[in-house]
Amino acid sequence: MTNFKKEKLLDLYKTAYFVRRSEEEIANNYRKGNIRCPTHLSIGQELVPAIISLFKNNSDLAVSSHRSHGHYLGKGGSLPGLFDELHGLETGCSGGNGGSMHLIDTSVGFMGSTAIVANTIPVGVGLASAIKLDRLNNVVYIFLGDGATEEGVFYESIHYASLKKLPCIFIIENNNFSVYTNLKSRQNIPLSQKIKGFGIKYFLNEKNNFLDLYEKMNIALDYSRSAKEPAIIEVMTHRYLEHCGPNSDDHLNYRDKTFLNDWSNLDILENIKLELNKNYISEHTINSINEETDLIVKSTFTESEEKFLLKLKKTK
C-alpha cells in the first residue's frame, strides 16, 4: 500500500461509514415529514468525501453543489449543524434558512453549497483568485457533478483558472446520470477530450479505487499548491438512491441491471473493508467503529428532531 498506512486506511473507513450512516439516518427519517426541504443524498458516493478527509486542512477552502452532505462532512463540517439545518432550526449551519442544498461551515473552510447546478464553480474560482492575490499557500476544492460540466460557466471557469494560474481542484463526481438521462445520451465525447485545449492537468479515477484516488489527489494537491495551477479530477461513481429523495428508484429501469450489479460489487465500504482485512484489521475493530458511529449519528439526529418537535409545539 504505497504511502498508505493502516491508520489512514482506518480513518478512510471511519469517514466513509460516518457519511453513509449520516445520510441513511436522514433517509430513514425523511418520511416522518419533519425534514421539509428537498434532499439529494450521496449514498454510494462516499469515496470523495472520505479521501478529502485525509487531506483535512481548514485553510483549504471548498464549495459544492446540491448534493453536498458528504463534502460538508468530509471537510469537517458539524453534524449537529447539518441535522439542525435539515430541520430548519436556528442552530443549523445556515441558521435554518438554507436546508439541505445550502450548507456552510467556514470554521473548516467549507464556504458553501447552492441548489443551482454549476452555480458555485465560479465562486470557487473567485476564492482561488483571492488566495493567489493574498499570496497564500492554500487550494480550493470545487465539487461538481457530471451534469454541471454541460453548463457554459464550467468552461468559462476552467478557462479563467488556467489562464490566471489559480490554485483550485475541480472534482467531478460522475455518476453517469443527470436525473434520469444517462451520459451517452448527453455527451458525445469524453470530458477528458473536451478539456484538452484548456491546458489543465486531468486525472481519472474509476471503479471506487481508493488507493488510486488517494495518489492522484496527493499529486493534484501538491501541483496546485506549489505551481499555483488548477487541476481536474474526474471520479466515476454511483448514487444508490433516487436523484432527490430517500427512496430507491431502480424499479423505473432507467439504469441497466448489469450497470447496477457492476456498481453493487464495487461498494466503497466493502472495498475498504477488504483492504482492512488484508492488513490484519479485525472484524471486531471494524464493528466497534460501526457501533460507535451508529450511536453518534442516531443520538445527534434524535436530539435535532426533538428540538424541531419542541419548536413545532410552541408555534401551535
Over which residues does each language-model region extend?
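Cofactor-/ligand-binding subdomain signature composed of acidic, glycine-rich
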Residues: 1-36, 58, 260, 275-278, ...
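Alpha-helix initiation and N-capping motif
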Residues: 6-10, 19, 23, 45, ...
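C-terminal intrinsically disordered, low-complexity extensions immediately downstream
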Residues: 308-316
